[in-house]
Design a protein with these regions (language model features):
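Receiver (REC) domain active-site loop signature in two-component systems and cognate sites
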Residues: 74
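Acidic, metal-coordinating helix/loop segments flanking the phosphotransfer/catalytic sites
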Residues: 49-67
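Acidic catalytic/metal-coordinating carboxylates
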Residues: 52-55, 78-84
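As written
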Residues: 79, 111-120
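C-terminal output helix
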Residues: 124-134
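Active-site residues of response regulator receiver
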Residues: 71
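Charged docking surfaces used in two-component/phosphorelay signaling
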Residues: 34-42
Length: 138
């Protein structure tokens, strides 16, 4: 592992961002995105945020995240369309996708068949989510 240490102003050392796992959060719920960003950063991850599948796809192509957290029900390009777009453009399978959704009335198997690696219903347990990210990420 290639770690680069940097000095903080108070003299503490920390590992620079180059080796932290990059998580892309795609969700239209601004408060939830903020909560996830804060919690994931505190857990040591780099965090990228997108409010819909279109922004998420752009972030994916530019930043190449290690894991994607994806909501299904969003305006614009929703989670279903995002998964389909990944399939069509060849990005499906390049990183694990964890679906986070309060609307799991659809058969979970359909979500997995579209390319999701795992599903967590909202509300979810944050430590469980972090464990799942660690388990699925390269």
């Amino acid at each position: 592992m290639n770690q680069v240490e940097t000095q903080k102003t108070n003299g503490e050392k920390r590992v620079a961002d180059v080796d932290r796992k990059r998580i892309l959060v795609i969700d239209d719920d601004l408060p939830l995105r903020g909560m996830l960003a804060a919690a994931l950063r505190q857990a040591g991850f780099q965090v990228l945020l997108a409010s819909d599948g279109g922004e998420g796809h752009r972030a994916l192509t530019i930043h190449r995240p290690d894991v994607i957290l994806l909501d299904l029900a969003m305006p614009g390009i929703n989670g279903w369309d995002f998964l389909q777009r990944l399939k069509e453009t060849g990005f499906l399978g390049t990183c694990p996708i964890i679906v986070l959704s309060a609307h799991l009335h659809v058969e979970p198997q359909a979500i997995l068949q579209l390319g999701a690696s795992a599903i967590l219903p909202k509300p979810f347990n944050l430590p469980e989510l972090i464990d799942l990210i660690e388990h699925l990420s390269p």
